[in-house]
Regions:
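Short aromatic/hydrophobic "clamp" motif used to bind/position activated sugar donors
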Residues: 179
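Short, acidic, metal-binding catalytic loop of nucleotide-sugar glycosyltransferases
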Residues: 116-126
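N-proximal low-complexity "stem/linker" segments adjacent to membrane-targeting elements
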Residues: 45-118, 329-344
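A recurrent flexible, glycine/aromatic-enriched loop bordering the glycosyltransferase active site
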Residues: 164, 222-247, 374-412
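Glycine-rich, basic loop-to-helix element that forms the pyrophosphate-binding segment
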Residues: 157-174
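A conserved acidic beta->alpha catalytic loop
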Residues: 133-141, 159, 349
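Conserved donor NDP-sugar-binding/catalytic core segment of glycosyltransferases
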Residues: 187, 191-222, 345-375
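A short, conserved alpha-helix in the catalytic core of glycosyltransferases
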Residues: 252, 261-285, 314, 397-407, ...
């Protein structure tokens, strides 16, 4: 049974008392720091009905313009001239070649062909397609004979090779500056590599990832859009969220390589080991994950193999860094919980604040995590509601968190007292009736902490009830 605490401001200038009655801490967590609670106005919010998702391909004029940009670059123009107005923000001035790697073993040819067509239909032509085929039959090779394109490089690979070994060898053979993989059956949107090219030119990214959705085996119906956050370290430590499309600089890939021992979580292990300073998110759906590819990947694999591999990758991440942490399953697919010993501040010097959720007595979210506009994330949601990808129930980094449910790094306690606690010289404010002032001070304190270079971690299992 989880422990309960409540702290209440009784009058201006007094420090938060430590009476325990209504704060629920994560199981095994350390004692709560000073905090205060105010009575929330528990109004039931009406939710906007969820609209059916429809993937919208870019307009024809947009795709034509992208092709025109590539044609001009191919014709010898400098990228900054071909791109026109957006060239002023370019950090890279050489055109990247992207190596797209597809591994095959006796694939269903119609699925392979769908994937092939989606790659050959790219508006950005600066790529090569590497097919590493371990099939005994000639189906893949015969299909490629109908698509004679100088950018296709076919390799027949003898023997029964693991996916990690195949991709590592293909990466050595690749001529590109960047690499990505596409599973048979999955589809790239027509503008996928163009948007990757733009991101590379503008940011010089080492690793890029995009949003994705799911499609049926025919590639006609789309659902379950996965709109991902920008790089979020603690969300990555809780969930293999980058997934597809993942693009990485070839030199970095060759330095890290995929490891056979993490089959089922190869790219997750790779990203966890990679430097994070040059990771960039392309916030567009550029990859369609097919039900056909998912069925193919699960064939011959234990049902829990992927989760076990992801958990092992996380455990290896902490072991290498000598961080005492226990990784456990949460019961939600692909979501993990990390328990630090003795606590997160002792284990990680990059964390300044640990925040949680503020719930009403009717188990509705009334506070906890704030977005940059100062709005409460998931406000009005039920306590057990996770939303898409269980994001509302997953540990992640936050812009700001609520002072009513907050733990502070010991060496930041003085700053906390200066900003959050009321100095004696100010007029009395009834915090029970002034949630805006509480929100303002919470966000100001968190902003100062982030300016000092610390992360703010939001843990939805750390709860205050008001």
């Amino acid at each position: 049974m989880r422990e309960h605490n409540v702290s209440v401001w009784s009058e201006f200038g007094k420090k938060i008392n430590s009476a325990r009655s209504k704060i629920r801490l994560p199981k095994g967590s350390e004692d709560s720091p000073k905090r205060f609670a105010l009575r929330a106005n528990d109004k039931k919010q009406e939710k906007t009905p969820r609209q059916k998702y429809v993937y919208q391909e870019p307009e024809a004029s947009v795709l034509l313009n992208q092709r025109a940009v590539w044609d001009r670059i191919k014709g010898g123009e400098k990228p900054e001239d071909a791109l026109g107005a957006s060239a002023s923000v370019l950090k890279v001035h050489h055109v990247p070649l992207i190596s797209v790697i597809v591994t095959t073993y006796e694939p269903v040819i119609r699925y392979f062909e769908q994937t092939l067509i989606s790659i050959l239909s790219q508006t950005y032509g600066g790529y090569e397609l590497i097919i590493a085929d371990t099939s005994l039959s000639s189906g893949v090779r015969d299909t490629l004979d109908h698509y004679r394109d100088e950018r296709i490089r076919y390799y027949s690979v003898p023997g029964n090779r693991g996916e990690a070994s195949l991709i590592n060898d293909a990466a050595h053979l690749a001529a590109g500056n960047y690499l990505c993989t596409v599973d048979v059956g999955d589809l790239l949107t027509k503008d996928a590599l163009y948007e990757v090219f733009l991101c590379i030119m503008r940011t010089g990214a080492e690793i890029l990832y995009t949003d994705e959705d799911h499609c049926d085996a025919a590639g006609k119906r789309f659902d379950r859009p996965n709109r991902k956050p920008d790089f979020n370290k603690d969300y990555l430590l809780s969930n293999n969220y980058m997934q597809r499309l993942l693009v990485i600089r070839r030199e970095l890939f060759l330095a890290l390589r995929l490891r056979d021992s993490f089959d089922g979580a190869l790219t997750y292990d790779l990203v966890l080991r990679a430097p994070k300073s040059a990771v960039r998110h392309v916030p567009m759906i550029l990859y369609h994950r097919s039900s056909a590819s998912e069925e193919s990947k699960m064939a011959g694999r234990e049902p829990d193999a992927e989760a076990a591999a992801e958990k092992a990758a996380l455990e290896d991440y902490f072991r290498v860094r000598s961080i005492r942490a226990v990784v456990s399953y949460t019961g939600r697919k692909g979501i993990y919980r990390i328990k630090y010993s003795p606590n997160i501040f002792a284990c990680r010097s990059d964390v300044g604040i640990l925040g949680g959720r503020v719930l009403s007595r009717t188990h509705k979210v009334v506070g906890g995590m704030f977005d940059p506009q100062g709005r409460v994330m998931y406000e009005g949601w039920d306590e057990a509601e996770g939303g898409p990808m269980s994001r509302a129930l997953t540990v992640q980094n936050a812009f700001a968190v609520d002072a009513r449910c907050m733990k502070v790094r010991p060496d930041l306690q003085k700053l906390y007292e200066e900003i959050v606690e009321k100095p004696e010289s100010e007029p009395y404010v009834d915090w029970q009736k002034d949630p805006q002032e509480l929100r303002r001070r919470s966000i100001l304190f968190c902003s100062r902490v982030r300016e000092l270079g610390y992360l703010i971690v939001w843990d939805p299992s750390f709860i205050t009830v008001v």
